[in-house]
Amino acid sequence: MATIFSRIVAGEIPCYKVAEDDKFFAFLDINPMVKGHTLVIPKQEVDYIFDLSDNDLAAMQVFAKKVALAIGKAFPCKKVGQAVLGLEVPHAHIHLIPMQSEADMLFSNPKLKLSPDEFTEIASKISAAM
Ligand code: 5GP
């Protein structure tokens, strides 16, 4: 059965898309730690990120870099942090999180509740910065 993230890529489940190329897809995390929290995934369905081939892992990181630079332009911050957990969704993903402090990377923090309009605005600001 397809993962929830493959269903998002296929358009079967809605998302707030940030960017896409032939191999990778970026969209807003639905339970963001901060505004601009974005997920980057390979379209290839792989659970563990370190099971990707060397070439695909490198290409995913280059794609994530473009998205991260755009997040930093759209949401001024000290740096955009990157994290890989993958304990909840069995489809490899990189979290990109604009940080004002180390505390912004604590996954145990309460998540933001944003309206659809806010999500739409955030996604378009990042897309426009790409
Ligand atoms: P992890 O697997 O890295 O522990 O966490 C998975 C992340 O995916 C979480 O931050 C969660 O909010 C996000 N997530 C889970 N399901 C969905 C979904 O259906 N749509 C979006 N946009 N994000 C999701």
Name each model feature, range by range.
Residues 1-130:
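HIT superfamily nucleotide-processing domains
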